[in-house]
A protein has these predicted regions:
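Short beta->alpha linker loops
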Residues: 45, 67-68, 115, 140-143, ...
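ATP-dependent small-molecule kinase phosphotransfer cores
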Residues: 14-90
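Small-molecule kinase domains that catalyze NTP-dependent phosphoryl transfer to phosphate-bearing small molecules
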Residues: 76, 104-106, 122, 126, ...
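A conserved segment at the C-terminal end of the G1
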Residues: 1-10
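Short, acidic/turn-prone active-site loops that include or flank metal/cofactor-
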Residues: 14-17, 115-118, 137-140, 162
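Residue-level recognition of specific faces of alpha-helices
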Residues: 1, 18, 53, 60-63, ...
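ATP-dependent NMP and nucleoside kinases share a basic, alpha-helical "lid"
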Residues: 77-85, 89-126
């Protein structure tokens, strides 16, 4: 929605997918760490299988994050540099773990997006086709939503309809574009 409001958006999940394709250093490190059993027949990483491993074992999750987070941070920095070279001095970085990874200081402001837990589970089940148990493990591995909201400069309530969320995004985008973060 921020993109629709004319702001540049960098998607950390997209970068994570890009750095984990065959031939990339993170891919090789992940396969070494977790074994070939996480691969699909075509050689790509089976993200659901890997997710089941790392969200069941905090040690394995830390191992994966030690591989991917530095690469994701480099990808974000590279995209920010490119945007800056194009004269764009404001960007939204979509990254669920900014606060958890200790990278908060790199950003001028943090925007938390939240909705009720049941609603979040339902939406993720519909979007990702995972079981409730799998989704709850992932949610429970992240920072408490209330803590995240308190640690953020802005909060978007995503529990209502799309029009309500869009109105909040539009208002915040206008503030950001005017330099009021």
């Amino acid at each position: 929605m921020f993109r629709e409001e004319g702001l540049a958006v960098i998607d950390a999940d997209r970068i994570a997918r890009e750095i984990t394709v065959p031939g990339r250093p993170a891919y090789d490190a992940i396969v070494r760490a977790f074994g070939r059993g996480i691969l699909l027949p075509d050689g790509r990483i089976d993200r659901k299988r890997l997710g089941n491993i790392v969200f069941s074992d905090p040690g394995k999750r830390a191992e994966l994050e030690a591989i991917t987070h530095p690469e994701i941070a480099r990808g974000i920095a590279s995209e920010l540099y490119l945007l800056e070279s194009e004269g764009r001095n404001v960007a939204i970085v979509e990254a669920a773990l900014i606060l958890e990874t200790g990278r908060r200081a790199r950003f001028e402001a943090v925007i938390a997006v939240r909705c009720g837990r049941d609603q979040q589970v339902r939406r993720l089940m519909e979007r990702d086709g995972m079981s409730e148990e799998q989704i709850l493990r992932r949610i429970d591995s992240q920072m408490d939503p209330e803590e995240k909201a308190l640690a953020s400069e802005h909060v978007i309530d995503n529990s209502g309809d799309v029009a309500g969320t869009r109105a909040q995004v539009r208002a915040l985008a206008e503030r950001i574009k005017s330099g009021d973060t």
